[in-house]
Amino acid sequence: MASSMLSTAAVACINRASPAQASMVAPFTGLKSTSAFPTTRKTTTDITSIASNGGRVQCMQVWPPRGKKFYETLSYLPPLTREQLAKEVEYLLRKGWVPCLEFELEHGTVYREYHRSPGYYDGRYWTMWKLPMFGCTDAVQVLQELDEMIKAYPDCYGRIIGFDNVRQVQCISFLAYKPKGAE
C-alpha cells in the first residue's frame, strides 16, 4: 500500500515537471565559428604593426632625480598662492573632509634613514599640528592655523590634509609651505 502511494506521487512529480522541461533553454555548446566575421590579416613582414609612440616621446619629460625633490601632490607646480591654497581648502571642505595640518622639520620628502626597505622612519609620517579641525567650515580658519604653524616653526615643511572621517582615510594631501632656501 505504501509502495503504491509512493509510486503514484513520483509519477505525479514527473508528470508535473514535464511541461517545465519542454520550455528549458538548450545547454551551452561552445562558441560559434568566427568565419562569419570579416577580418584582415597582416603579413608577418609588416613592421607597421609594432606599437610605437615615437611622436609623443619627444614631448614627454622625466622628473629629474637630482636637484628637484618631489614633495607632495601639486609640488611640481610653482608654490601655490594664498588664493590657490584657499581654493584647495574650500574644495576639501565642500567634500566634507576634515582639514588637518602636518609639519616636518628636517625632510619634506620620503627618505630612507635606518633601513633600505620602507618603514616608519622613512619620512611618510609627519607631526600633526594641534588636532584635526573637526567642524571647520571656513578656509580662512585653516590658513590662520597654517600661519601659526609657520610662525612657530619657520624652517618646517607644512602640508594640508583632507581626512574623510566616515571612511577613515586620507583623501587629499598637498604641500602648503616650504621653508626659504628649500629646493
Curated annotation (Swiss-Prot):
GO terms for cellular component: chloroplast. GO terms for molecular function: ribulose-bisphosphate carboxylase activity. Disulfide bonds: none annotated. The keyword Plastid applies. GO terms for biological process: photorespiration; reductive pentose-phosphate cycle. Keywords: Calvin cycle, Carbon dioxide fixation, Chloroplast, Photorespiration, Photosynthesis, Plastid, Transit peptide. The keyword RNA-binding does not apply. Residues 1-58 form a transit peptide. Its main location: plastid. It is found in: Plastid, Chloroplast. Heterohexadecamer of 8 large and 8 small subunits. RuBisCO catalyzes two reactions: the carboxylation of D-ribulose 1,5-bisphosphate, the primary event in carbon dioxide fixation, as well as the oxidative fragmentation of the pentose substrate. Both reactions occur simultaneously and in competition at the same active site. Although the small subunit is not catalytic it is essential for maximal activity. HAMAP family: RuBisCO_S_bact. Belongs to the RuBisCO small chain family. The basic functional RuBisCO is composed of a large chain homodimer in a 'head-to-tail' conformation. In form I RuBisCO this homodimer is arranged in a barrel-like tetramer with the small subunits forming a tetrameric 'cap' on each end of the 'barrel'. This is Ribulose bisphosphate carboxylase small subunit, chloroplastic. It comes from Hevea brasiliensis. The gene is RBCS.
